[in-house]
Amino acid sequence: MERTFVALKPDTVERKLVGRVIQRFEDRGFEIVEMRMLTLTMEMAEEYYGEHKGKEFYERLIKFMTSGRIVAMVIKGERAISTVRKMLGNTCPCDAEPGTIRGDFGLYTPANIIHASDSLESAEREIDLFFGR
């Protein structure tokens, strides 16, 4: 079974959508094996999004991700990384298909509800960052 990292962003928590988003993963047969709610420090956010440093959206993303609580999760299941990414939909909610998490709940970028690892390497790095492995 494959594991992936998922973070529900501050807009998800603020809009009280956490349960509805988690339900989608459980309905699809995925198992939530670890979960914690936290507020990212500036340092943690910068490490988490370090690959984007220098990009035009970086500062806005860091500010947004440190603006409130997030829910960090490890999700396990068959082809978890690719399937979860498909469930999310396009990064920009306005381009996300209805029926995807971002298509149904996202408002704008970076308030697009959710992040999920895009590769096995990213999943391992992000799980280690948030859950200390």
Swiss-Prot record:
Single GO cellular component term: cytoplasm
Pfam families, sorted: NDK
Catalytic activity: a 2'-deoxyribonucleoside 5'-diphosphate + ATP = a 2'-deoxyribonucleoside 5'-triphosphate + ADP; a ribonucleoside 5'-diphosphate + ATP = a ribonucleoside 5'-triphosphate + ADP
Family: Belongs to the NDK family.
Classification via PROSITE patterns: NDPK (PS00469), NDPK_LIKE (PS51374)
Record-level GO BP terms: CTP biosynthetic process; GTP biosynthetic process; UTP biosynthetic process
EC number: 2.7.4.6
Localization per record: Cytoplasm
Keyword terms: ATP-binding, Cytoplasm, Kinase, Magnesium, Metal-binding, Nucleotide metabolism, Nucleotide-binding, Phosphoprotein, Transferase
Originating species: Methanococcus maripaludis (strain DSM 14266 / JCM 13030 / NBRC 101832 / S2 / LL)
Main location: cytoplasm
Physiological role: Major role in the synthesis of nucleoside triphosphates other than ATP. The ATP gamma phosphate is transferred to the NDP beta phosphate via a ping-pong mechanism, using a phosphorylated active-site intermediate.
Protein name, per record: Nucleoside diphosphate kinase
SMART domains membership: NDK
Coiled coil residues, start to end: none
One MF term in the entry's GO annotations: metal ion binding
Cofactor: Mg(2+)
Active site: H115 (pros-phosphohistidine intermediate)
Sites where the protein binds ATP: K9, F57, R85, T91, R102, N112
Enzyme class: transferase
